[in-house]
């Protein structure tokens, strides 16, 4: 009887003693930043590259993770800190000596059986505080201004190097970046234009004599509006040839890049009082029933004729005269390949060669040139490419650039 009771108790308890099958851990998500290559992510989270690529399939297996996208990590991934070094010629022994790390400890932490075998350019992790990232040689930090990016806006990269910034250059899908450096800091800026295809173009950075560093950058889609404009009178007589001739002359001015930023404050809107924003940047335009072959290159502020137009930031006036298409025109060079233009003015008060400060009067609102009514057309260019001036202000790109160089950025609006 006792044996029977024991069996019953055992049968009752036994199921509770059997461990339930472990639930699979849910994948983690990670937003890709510059330097998050497959090898860097593998070392940072302790996951094989092959496993990461299985979790994040792409038709091009050799393509690095795209900046601004979200990728999956195994649920058991555990992050560690350190600094990634591309081994190259010195070898692991030289890396250990340079970083004051025990040789065998460095080999063990990098999964090497022996420190005396060649590493064949394999990246190494040395103990350090900070995030493990695979950056251009000599560069210790790198960030982008927008992630994901948008076509038609100002884009930038900024970072720092171990010592003085090496000779640095770069491009985004063939569009060159304009760089400024200060001590161990650097900033690069580029514009894409409203017709930029977007997708996942490659950001390429060249640091010194080292091979180019490449990582794709995600662009989100942007919605544009379509406008049909009817031109009459003198404005209707302005043909495409006249536009091209005027633009060719201005491109010569826009190509002369001042290497340093000339501004110290946030850009202010160049008209203190206006009726409305009558046209935004990027709007696709048809003139007198023609095809939509162009886009609006600036921001239009509808205002009463004679309203003062002022400088948004410090810079040098490089043109101040009436033009055939743009009418009364003032163009300012703000440095670092950044220019602003003020068109259709009824009166011009600035002089070419003049240095201006925020709030200085440039001219007055009018309707000269290719215009359908009193308004100010304000545009902003980077390396000769038009970008959205309104988004520049929203992003506070002016301060983002200055802060990247370690400079202060004022935010006070000058008195009117």
Each model region followed by its residue ranges:
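Zn2+-dependent peptidoglycan hydrolase active-site motif and core
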Residues: 296-297, 311-349, 374-379
């Amino acid at each position: 009887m006792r044996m029977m009771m024991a069996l019953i108790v055992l049968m009752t308890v036994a199921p509770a003693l059997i461990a339930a099958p472990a639930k699979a851990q849910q994948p983690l998500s990670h937003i890709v930043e510059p330097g998050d290559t497959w090898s860097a992510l593998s070392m940072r989270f302790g996951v094989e590259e092959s496993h990461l690529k299985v979790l994040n399939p792409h038709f091009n297996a050799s393509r690095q993770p795209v900046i601004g996208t979200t990728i999956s990590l195994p649920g058991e991934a555990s992050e560690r800190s350190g600094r990634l070094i591309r081994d190259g010629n010195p070898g692991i022994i030289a890396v250990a000596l340079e970083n004051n790390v025990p040789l065998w400890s460095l080999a063990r932490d990098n999964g090497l059986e022996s420190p005396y075998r060649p590493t064949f350019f394999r990246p190494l992790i040395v103990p350090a505080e900070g995030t493990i990232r695979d950056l251009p040689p000599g560069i210790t930090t790198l960030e982008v201004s927008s992630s994901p990016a948008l076509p038609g806006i100002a884009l930038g990269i900024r970072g720092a190097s171990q010592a003085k910034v090496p000779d640095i250059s770069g491009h985004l899908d063939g569009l060159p970046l304009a760089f400024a450096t200060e001590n161990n800091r650097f900033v690069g800026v580029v514009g894409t234009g409203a017709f930029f295809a977007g997708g996942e173009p490659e950001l390429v950075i060249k640091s010194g004599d080292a091979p180019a560093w490449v990582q794709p950058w995600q662009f989100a889609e942007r919605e544009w509006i379509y406008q049909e404009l009817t031109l009459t009178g003198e404005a209707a007589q302005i043909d495409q040839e006249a536009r091209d001739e005027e633009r060719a002359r201005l491109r010569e001015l826009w190509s002369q890049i001042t290497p340093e930023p000339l501004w110290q404050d946030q850009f202010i809107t160049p008209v203190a009082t206006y009726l409305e924003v009558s046209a935004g940047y990027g709007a696709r335009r048809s003139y007198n029933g023609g095809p939509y072959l162009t886009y609006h290159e600036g921001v239009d502020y509808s205002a009463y004729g004679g309203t003062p137009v002022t400088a948004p930031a410090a810079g040098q006036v490089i043109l101040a005269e009436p033009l055939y298409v743009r009418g009364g025109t003032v163009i300012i060079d703000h440095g670092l390949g950044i220019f602003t233009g003020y068109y259709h003015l009824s009166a011009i008060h600035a002089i070419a060669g003049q240095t201006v400060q925020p709030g200085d009067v440039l001219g007055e609102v009018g309707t000269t040139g290719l215009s359908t009514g009193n308004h100010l057309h304000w545009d902003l260019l980077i390396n000769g490419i038009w970008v959205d001036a309104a988004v520049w202000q929203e992003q506070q790109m002016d301060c983002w650039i200055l802060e990247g160089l370690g400079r202060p950025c004022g935010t006070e609006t000058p008195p009117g």
